[in-house]
């Protein structure tokens, strides 16, 4: 949203991508909504099969989300967050480092949507319209990436 000359962040876009970076599901929430609340709904929308790793940043770290992933038979790859007054152990830091190395497959999705479709700003007012914009950007991104991925698969 725009107020005067400054833009205010009013919505969050939660995206679940596959291993190749294609968008599988997307949820738009108000900016004041915590990330931890959204992960179970995001996974449910994507209809993930058992045994798949779910990688996420520290904003999605909670005991409830870990239990949800375990219950569905998914591998928990959510980065661990330090508790108040406690530091992460060496093993936990190594785990976070291993997870962060996998972000190179996920982050280009967000950068490409932002670069190709001006995806950094809301064009509309209201949650439903912003969600529609996010869905259209994700569909356009998937369509733009698909021919290149099909060519790569035919070469292999």
Language model features by range: what are they?
Residues 31, 80-84:
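Short, acidic/turn-prone active-site loops that include or flank metal/cofactor-
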Residues 73, 94-156:
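Basic, amphipathic alpha-helical segments enriched in Lys/Arg and hydrophobic/aromatic residues
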Residues 1-58, 63-71, 136, 140:
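Polybasic low-complexity intrinsically disordered regions
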Residues 63-64, 86-88, 120-122:
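Short active-site-adjacent structural elements
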Residues 50-54, 77-78, 148-152:
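Acidic/polar loop patches that form or flank catalytic/metal-binding clefts of enzymes
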Residues 58, 80-81, 108:
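Short secondary-structure boundary segments
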Residues 37, 85-92:
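Short, charged, surface-exposed secondary-structure boundary motifs
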Residues 72-80:
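Short hydrophobic/aromatic-enriched beta-strand-loop microsegments
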């Amino acid at each position: 949203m725009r107020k005067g000359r400054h833009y205010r962040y009013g919505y969050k876009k939660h995206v679940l991508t596959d291993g190749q970076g294609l968008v599988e599901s997307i949820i738009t929430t108000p900016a004041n909504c915590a990330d931890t609340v959204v992960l179970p709904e995001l996974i449910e929308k994507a209809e993930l099969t058992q045994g798949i790793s779910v990688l996420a940043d520290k904003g999605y770290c909670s005991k409830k989300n870990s239990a949800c992933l375990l219950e569905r038979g998914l591998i928990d790859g959510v980065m661990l967050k330090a508790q108040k007054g406690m530091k992460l152990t060496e093993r936990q830091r190594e785990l976070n480092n291993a997870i962060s190395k996998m972000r190179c497959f996920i982050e280009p999705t967000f950068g490409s949507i932002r670069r190709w479709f001006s995806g950094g700003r809301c064009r509309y007012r209201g949650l439903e319209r912003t969600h529609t914009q996010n869905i259209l950007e994700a569909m356009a991104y998937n369509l733009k990436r698909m021919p290149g991925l099909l060519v790569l698969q035919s070469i292999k």
